[in-house]
Structure formats: structure tokens, C-alpha cells
């Protein structure tokens, strides 16, 4: 008779259930003397049904009372709060799957892999838990009595790229619109891991629905994680779109106190722009324009553009030409190739590939997000890709945060709680100039 794997899995599931129930009984018995010693009296035993990663379990646990206070030691041991239907581990698993799959696909995956049924609303609630944890972790920073500053990265070059990711969102009035997610990427170069594979060193990504907050978070990270010296070079790359121009990165350079800054007009976007513009004109002009860029000869580019102007026949063509000419001449310095700046091109222009993990999950397929939900999902995707989502759920910071969890956060209360100011710099935008002002607290 052939081995029945399905039947074996069913038997193992039942064995796990019985073993779990036994451990609950053992824990209840072991904690009883401690509860009595602390003045609690056992009232009764009540049942509860919870979905775990190993199945749906109905179990009975003791209820203890001291005065008006009631405790369920088993619930605390399992990390279960009042009315909690899903275990913390299962919530984490749902959130992890949701960073890669649609909510309905997560339900199917959980059903196939875990042999339990969850709803798409449960998956949605799991992502909301992530949003809440992200807020708590950010809030927790201001309650620290003592903080060990992170070990600063010593790097001669800091690479920084920025771009936006457009996603479809809905407002409270069910109005649909497009929202731009701000995405910044920081790294210190590339490292070869196999013959044909390279990875970014010290990679860190920041994403937010608010452009200003993303920039503040970026500066906060750079100040606290990098050792800036007179030899540090800030190498930036972008498509020069709104919010990601050279001026934006120059403000960062000034705030960091970096002396040398090299900004690149992203090669992919630049080539696409040139190719699109020269499509109606002779191919020779396109080749000469590319040569002007590769050799960084501005007079040659101006000659090519003057030749194009002589071929213009309509007003629409002239408007397109004038806009293109202005942008090319104004930003020509940013088109200088890396090799002519004595820099390596490796590690430049990687933002589009870093976008994919977000766009594959959040764009197309008719998906719409709330503003808050879009921000949470994008951050969740980034955490999952660097294996930090589990730390958000079960890291030591959560235990340290518990004493402050129910306290209202304010500057005055924070000052009372913090004996010594944490060695963290915080930033805000200048009211008139729009430039960042640093505040060490």
C-alpha cells in the first residue's frame, strides 16, 4: 500500500493540537502557585478559540482574580489580547504574505499552506497592525532614557538616489486620485557576490507619502549613521523631476557639511528623453547629440540643437524644441559621464530596479489604496525584503516600549521621561528658505 502523505499530515496536525493543549495545561498548573502567592484566586476555567499557524484551536484556561483585577496567565503567555482571534505569529505571517500578494491571494495561500481559513478582512487588519507598530516604534524613540548611538559607517562615497512612485489612492469621500510615494535610496557602493551578481553595500531605503517628511527622515538617517569627513563625496542621481532636482540634493549636501557633491542626470531617463525628442529628425543628429553627451562637449550639443531649429516647421514643434533645449543646456553639467569625473558608474542608476518590489505589489490590477494604507504597505515591503518585518513584530523594543504605551506623547512629557537627551539629531524645514535646519537634542 502506497504511503498516504495527506493522511500523515492530518495525523501530525492532530498531534500538534494535542501537544499544544498539553503545554497549556502544564503552564496553567505551573503558574498557579505564583498567582496564589501574589494574592490571586482562581475563579473558573473558560474556553477560547484562536487561529494559530498550526490550526484552529479551542482551549480552556484558568481565570484568576484579585479584587477588581482579572488575569488570564495563559493568554499573556501566548501573547493574546482581549477578543484576539488570530495569534501574533499568524498575524505576522499574513502581513508577510500581504507584502507580496493581494489580500485574496494571501487567503488562498494560508488555506493551502497552513490548512486554515482566513478572510481578506483579517489580512487587511494584519497590515493595519503593521502601521500601528511602525507608529509605535517611531514614537518609542522619544521615550528612551538611554540610547546607544548606532555605529557610524565610514565610507568615502555616499550614493543617494530619489524618485517618486505613483499609486492610485482614494480619499474619505471615495474620490480617486494619484498619489506620489517619495522613495529615497542610500548606499555606499557595490560588492560582487558571484560572477554575474552585484549587491549594494549598506543599503537603506526610505519611503513616505509626504515628501518633506521623507527628506527629514533621510537627513536623520544620514546624520546618525554616517561619519562625514572632508574627504566624503556625496554622489546623487535622479531624473531631475519635481522634488528630485540637483537643488534638493545640494540642500542635503549643505546640511551634512559635505564639501564635494557630484550630481548625475539619470542615464536611462536622459537617453529616453533624447531618443524621444530626436525621433522626427535625421538619425545623424541623434548620434551627434549622444556623442556630445558622452564626450561632454557643450558646443557640439548647441550646434546640433541649432541645426534642429532650422528644421522646425510648426509652432508645436518649436515649443517642444524650446523646452528640450532649455532643460538640456541648463542641466548639461549633470550629464557628464562618471568616467570623466574619475568615478565608477557602478552603483549609479539603480533606483528603477529598487522601485520594482513596490510597483509589482502596489500598481496595476485595478488596485486602489488609502493614503495611510499606501504608506504602510510600501514600508512593509521594504522591511520584508531586508528580513526586518519579524523584528518589528517581536523585537526587544516592544517589551521596552510597554511602560510608555498608554501614555500621551508630548514634548513636555518626553522631557520628564528622558533623563539624558538621546544623541539623535532631528530636523525641520526652514519656514521661508525651505532649507533644513539641524537641531541636536
Where are these regions (language model features)?
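Catalytic center-proximal scaffold of phosphoryl-transfer enzymes
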Residues: 1-21, 64-441
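N-terminal "assembly arms/tails" that initiate or stabilize quaternary assembly
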Residues: 14-34
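N-terminal juxtadomain amphipathic helix
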Residues: 28-61
Amino acid at each position: 500500500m502506497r504511503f498516504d502523505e495527506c493522511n500523515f499530515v492530518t495525523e501530525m496536525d492532530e498531534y500538534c493540537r494535542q501537544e499544544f493543549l498539553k503545554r497549556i495545561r502544564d503552564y496553567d498548573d505551573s503558574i498557579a502557585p505564583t498567582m496564589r502567592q501574589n494574592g490571586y484566586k482562581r475563579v473558573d476555567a473558560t474556553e477560547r478559540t484562536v487561529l494559530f499557524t498550526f490550526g484552529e484551536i479551542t482551549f480552556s484556561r484558568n481565570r484568576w482574580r484579585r479584587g477588581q483585577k482579572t488575569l488570564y496567565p495563559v493568554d499573556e503567555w501566548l501573547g493574546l489580547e482581549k477578543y484576539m482571534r488570530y495569534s501574533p505569529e499568524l498575524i505576522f505571517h499574513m502581513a508577510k504574505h500581504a507584502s507580496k500578494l493581494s489580500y485574496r491571494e494571501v487567503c488562498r495561500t494560508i488555506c493551502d499552506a497552513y490548512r486554515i481559513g482566513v478572510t481578506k478582512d483579517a489580512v487587511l487588519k494584519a497590515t493595519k497592525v503593521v502601521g500601528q507598530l511602525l507608529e509605535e516604534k517611531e514614537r518609542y524613540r522619544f521615550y528612551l532614557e538611554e540610547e546607544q548611538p548606532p555605529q557610524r559607517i565610514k565610507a568615502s562615497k555616499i550614493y543617494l538616489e530619489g524618485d517618486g512612485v505613483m499609486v492610485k489612492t482614494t480619499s474619505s469621500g471615495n474620490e480617486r486620485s494619484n498619489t506620489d510615494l517619495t522613495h529615497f535610496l542610500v548606499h555606499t557602493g557595490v560588492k560582487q557576490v558571484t560572477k554575474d551578481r552585484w549587491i549594494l553595500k549598506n543599503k537603506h531605503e526610505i519611503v513616505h507619502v509626504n515628501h518633506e517628511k521623507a527628506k527629514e527622515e533621510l537627513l536623520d538617517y544620514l546624520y546618525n549613521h554616517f561619519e562625514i569627513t572632508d574627504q566624503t563625496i556625496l554622489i546623487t542621481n535622479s531624473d531631475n523631476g519635481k522634488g528630485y532636482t540637483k537643488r534638493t540634493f545640494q540642500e542635503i549636501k549643505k546640511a551634512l557639511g559635505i564639501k564635494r557633491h557630484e550630481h548625475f542626470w539619470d542615464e536611462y531617463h536622459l537617453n529616453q528623453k533624447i531618443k524621444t525628442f530626436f525621433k522626427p529628425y535625421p538619425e545623424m543628429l541623434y548620434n551627434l547629440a549622444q556623442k556630445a553627451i558622452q564626450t561632454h562637449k557643450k558646443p557640439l550639443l548647441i550646434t546640433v540643437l541649432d541645426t534642429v531649429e532650422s528644421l522646425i516647421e510648426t509652432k508645436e514643434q518649436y515649443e517642444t524644441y524650446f523646452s528640450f533645449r532649455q532643460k538640456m543646456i541648463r542641466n548639461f553639467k549633470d550629464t557628464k559621464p562618471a568616467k570623466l569625473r574619475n568615478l565608477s558608474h557602478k552603483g549609479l542608476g539603480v533606483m528603477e530596479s529598487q522601485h520594482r518590489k513596490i510597483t509589482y505589489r502596489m500598481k496595476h490590477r485595478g488596485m486602489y489604496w488609502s493614503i495611510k494604507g499606501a504608506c504602510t504597505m510600501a514600508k512593509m515591503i521594504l522591511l520584508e525584503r531586508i528580513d526586518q518585518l519579524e523584528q518589528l513584530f517581536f523585537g526587544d523594543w516592544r517589551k521596552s516600549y510597554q511602560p510608555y504605551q498608554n501614555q500621551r506623547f508630548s514634548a513636555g512629557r518626553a522631557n520628564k521621561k528622558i533623563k539624558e537627551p538621546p544623541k539623535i539629531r532631528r530636523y525641520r524645514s526652514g519656514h521661508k528658505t525651505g532649507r533644513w535646519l539641524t537641531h541636536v537634542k
